[in-house]
């Protein structure tokens, strides 16, 4: 088990933790559909990334009432 060699003061501990804060990513507007998306990620709404379709969107399937 790790044991500290010297006591770390509250000031030094807090100064070390000053860089640990999480920053929320700024959402960008999709160039294809205009929805907000995460930077450098595929758009969840249309499946485009860098002006090309990466994920093909499935069309909605209509079910007959008799089949259900």
From Swiss-Prot:
GO terms for cellular component: large ribosomal subunit. It comes from the Bacteria. GO terms for biological process: translation. One of its GO terms (molecular function) is structural constituent of ribosome. Keywords: Ribonucleoprotein, Ribosomal protein. Signal peptide: none annotated. Pfam families: Ribosomal_L32p. Belongs to the bacterial ribosomal protein bL32 family. This is Large ribosomal subunit protein bL32. It comes from Ruegeria pomeroyi (strain ATCC 700808 / DSM 15171 / DSS-3). The gene is rpmF.
């Amino acid at each position: 088990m790790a044991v500290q060699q010297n006591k770390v003061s509250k000031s030094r501990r807090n100064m070390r933790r000053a860089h640990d804060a999480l920053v929320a990513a700024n959402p960008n507007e999709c160039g294809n559909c205009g929805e907000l998306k995460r930077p450098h990620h595929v758009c969840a709404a249309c499946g485009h990334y860098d002006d090309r379709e990466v994920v093909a969107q499935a069309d909605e399937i209509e079910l007959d009432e008799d089949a259900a």
